[in-house]
Amino acid sequence: IYGKKTPGEVVDSLICEGTIVCSGSVIDSMLGYDCIIHRNASVEKSVILSGCYIGQGAKVKNVLMDKNCHIDPSVEIGYDIERDAERFPFRTPNGLVVLPKGSRVHNDGPIEIAYDLVEVLRQDPSTSEIMRLHEGKYIESSRNRHSFTAVGD
């Protein structure tokens, strides 16, 4: 409601300096430096590294998010294992979604991986097969969006 202050909720979590939680909820999670968690967003059982952005109304559960990732408003991750398996190339056997550094998750469509990491992930022996199997299920970001650029920059 516009003009009304709504408290955020933080339970059993660690939130680092510079991170802002705007009346969202953070439960059993760790948030790195300089993250922004927007209104009505929720983070549960997740590790979010520095410089990440979680949009208004987004719900993130069981996610390991590397630095400088961006989650669009109303996105849900970790609530539909089958959808997550189709959408996200990197997942652990128990369903934890791993987002590479500088990734962006849109409401619909494929995950956007920072262009400077795509070739690294394709060449790395530990990730090359996953990238090959998921070809067409992710997109490469434009050249003006680097993995080392924080959302606020």
Enumerate the predicted regions with their spans.
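Left-handed beta-helix
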Residues: I1-D153
